[in-house]
């Protein structure tokens, strides 16, 4: 019996790409995890303003404040992710914590011109989260060997062989520098005796046999967030037109682990099981600009905001481990200690939001935000000419425009405020069911120099999870039932 283990820890740069359209969606998606009042009104503040988290929605929101204030929030997510793969259902529970903090200074009656008020502020909050923990398990007639076979298509056998004077480590490094990610996957499978090569047909074939289906288990754990720091300037002209500018700094950090296990091959199969692990560490930074307007028309307010693309630079580190157990061989372990290192850029699509709000007798407020984003405008790039042409072409073909909706309302009853809202975010990938529907609610108390707010949301997030990007492309249906709680305290001065 033979165990082939390939494990990589030595850091080196890879001449190739492993990013795909799912990465483009993740880097472009905006969840806007703000303070309690912002959440409880469905993140709908595009024409209302006057909220620290609302600055991230519309830069003109800052000059709606009458007094300066600072505030902070604690956000707690309770998730239950249910997966359905080939009729087998699993569920995993998890809890995650986030935060929000901001401050804004308001200057009124400054000079004798038509600039009645202006403000400077800074706000920090999570723009998106990458925390997930779920299990996909079931019987399948397709094997992960197809992933390796697809990556081996067109690969020359002499390039993934280990010759005299070479090592697993040196060949793997050479493949990364010269051919990239796909050839490395073929190398893993060939050296682990999952794939063999037919000299007559000049093609690779799998040594695994599975006529009666396979048992598969895929565990996914990810921790990370896209944090956004916003520097805001806003003013009001002639007591009618609020306008503002945001300069945004983005920071992305993600740690993810994907463990795929497959067994129950035929009794005469040369392969007994496959255990394939991928650990990915992503670190990125970016910059974006926002412009916003809010125009007052009697009891109504009309808002408009434009978000520029976000220009990101990324550094990824990929650790891989492939273990294949085969019959009729003595144990053997190969451990070259390699880390794949990728440097690349991503430009997210721009976004436009139109808002309408009304305030009735300073008691009842209503707001509607309609946001448009063209996901196909996302673009990967690197110093390698043409490296991302096929990936970007795939984005243009498969990602569509989306329209998202946010509705919020607030009723003031003295020091008590009652709030509610709806969030609807749609999926740019037309071939999948993948959207977020959230119902939000909350309440708050306004004291002489402070406020205390509580916000809650219930969400059903539907998504199809595809096991691999090629070959084994079977999908599991995921439903994330999430309950989010936020508590916020603000000081007014």
Predicted regions and their residues:
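Bacterial Sec-dependent N-terminal signal peptides
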Residues: 1-22, 493
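Outer-membrane beta-barrel porins/channels
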Residues: 19-33, 38-39, 106-493
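Outer-membrane beta-barrel translocator/receptor signature
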Residues: 36, 48-57, 63-139, 227
